[in-house]
């Protein structure tokens, strides 16, 4: 009988331990959207653009462009290196 209670309590502990993950799963979502300067200018500036998008249930515009766009101009930094050296920082 005691063994049955121990097994039941262990199963209950496993279920209760996983319950927060079942009820509310964590998810990451952006707090803003990247929009072009032309789009922001179309609405009359960043403040007006943010107000318009929030009014229509959308995310506001981010302050700067994504990090991927900032590095696009630096793609040719390994241009003269061999394939072996491109993979190593010390070549």
UniProtKB/Swiss-Prot annotation:
Pfam family, one: DUF7199
Region (Disordered): 58-81
The protein's name in its UniProt record: Gene 76 protein
Upper taxonomic lineage: Viruses, Duplodnaviria, Heunggongvirae, Uroviricota, Caudoviricetes
